[in-house]
């Protein structure tokens, strides 16, 4: 396996990126949300943040022309890169020809049989980290698909729209806090590592990006009686952010006297005021609320 760092120009150097795209006659597709990073310092920082070494396998999503893949391959045991755009497969074969520890899988990550795919690693027992520059338009579905999968991904270091990274890592009583924060933080710790300006991409997106580091918890943050119901309660509590918890709950469950009586009992059991807003409740509070509402028959 070749792990020596390249001494010549990087794929991410702007002149190299442009030459590769021109040589292959590549044009960007908006439908794939393609923005290629052209800053080698940021790429190195991503690898450092992910703490990639020879004892780690990496799954990359959306390798593009291989700018990040190059850095990952120099450090990881193996890299499995999922690329949905079949036009990029021959380009990746060209740009990554010096590496024998990279597998390019021409498939949508949401449709891939990951349990089968990870067995293709030479050493599938090594910890697996996900490192990716995620397309803005499908960031959340990809993340939740991977987080909720049965595969014990140890860590995620992913680039995404800054606003989404802020929402995922947000704490209660902040504007960004919501059901997405809860859905991710139930399983993972989440912290914004650093900001990536829009100016370092080709083509430049309309907003800045952020690198979000997420580490899987040994166990979910809290224990709840019914996970699906817990996530349902957290989601419906933010449907109308400026409305009280009571208004959101009655909008969802109904306003009959029987329902309102059960809601009152559940809120009292969880020791939560009906007049509070969802953004003021911690994940632990939502766990207590969901369990209490379940207990009273909702």
From Swiss-Prot:
SMART domains: rADc
Binding site for S-adenosyl-L-methionine: 35, 37, 62, 83, 108, 133
Superkingdom of origin organism: Bacteria
Chief location: cytoplasm
E.C. number: 2.1.1.182
Annotated S-S bridges: none
Any GO MF annotation of the entry: 16S rRNA (adenine(1518)-N(6)/adenine(1519)-N(6))-dimethyltransferase activity
Keywords from the named record: Cytoplasm, Methyltransferase, RNA-binding, rRNA processing, S-adenosyl-L-methionine, Transferase
A Pfam short name: RrnaAD
Subcellular location: Cytoplasm
CDD domains per record: AdoMet_MTases
Coiled coil region boundaries: none
Catalysed reactions listed for this entry: adenosine(1518)/adenosine(1519) in 16S rRNA + 4 S-adenosyl-L-methionine = N(6)-dimethyladenosine(1518)/N(6)-dimethyladenosine(1519) in 16S rRNA + 4 S-adenosyl-L-homocysteine + 4 H(+)
Xref: InterPro entries: KsgA/Erm, rRNA_Ade_diMease-like_C, rRNA_Ade_Mease_Trfase_CS, rRNA_Ade_methylase_Trfase_N, rRNA_adenine_dimethylase, SAM-dependent_MTases_sf
PROSITE patterns hit by this protein: RRNA_A_DIMETH, SAM_RNA_A_N6_MT
Function statement: Specifically dimethylates two adjacent adenosines (A1518 and A1519) in the loop of a conserved hairpin near the 3'-end of 16S rRNA in the 30S particle. May play a critical role in biogenesis of 30S subunits.
Protein name in the entry: Ribosomal RNA small subunit methyltransferase A
Organism: Streptococcus pyogenes serotype M2 (strain MGAS10270)
């Amino acid at each position: 396996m070749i792990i020596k760092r390249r001494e010549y120009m990087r794929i991410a150097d702007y002149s190299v990126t442009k030459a590769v795209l021109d040589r292959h006659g590549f044009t960007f597709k908006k439908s794939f949300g393609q923005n290629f990073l052209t800053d080698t310092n940021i790429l190195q920082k991503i690898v450092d943040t992910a703490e990639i070494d020879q004892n780690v396998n990496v799954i990359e999503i959306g390798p593009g022309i291989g700018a990040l893949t190059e850095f990952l391959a120099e450090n990881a045991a193996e890299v499995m890169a999922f690329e949905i755009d079949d036009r990029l497969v021959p380009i990746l074969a060209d740009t990554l020809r010096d590496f024998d520890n990279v597998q390019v899988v021409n498939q949508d990550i949401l449709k891939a049989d990951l349990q089968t795919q990870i067995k293709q690693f030479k050493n599938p027992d090594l910890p697996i980290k996900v490192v990716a520059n995620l397309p803005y338009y499908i960031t959340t579905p990809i993340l939740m698909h991977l987080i909720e999968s049965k595969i014990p991904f140890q860590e995620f270091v992913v680039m995404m729209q800054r606003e989404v990274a802020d929402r995922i890592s947000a704490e209660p009583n902040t504007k960004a806090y919501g059901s997405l924060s809860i859905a991710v933080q139930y399983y993972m710790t989440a912290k914004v590592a650093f900001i990536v300006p829009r100016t370092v991409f080709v083509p430049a997106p309309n907003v800045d990006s952020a690198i979000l580091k997420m580490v899987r918890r040994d166990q979910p943050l809290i224990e709840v009686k019914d996970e699906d119901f817990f996530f349902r309660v957290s989601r419906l509590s933010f449907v109308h952010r400026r409305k009280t918890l009571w208004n959101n709950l009655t909008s969802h469950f109904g306003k009959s006297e029987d329902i309102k009586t059960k809601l009152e009992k559940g809120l009292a059991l969880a020791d939560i005021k009906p007049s509070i807003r969802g953004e003021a409740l911690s994940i632990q509070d939502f766990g207590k609320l969901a369990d209490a509402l379940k207990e009273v028959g909702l």
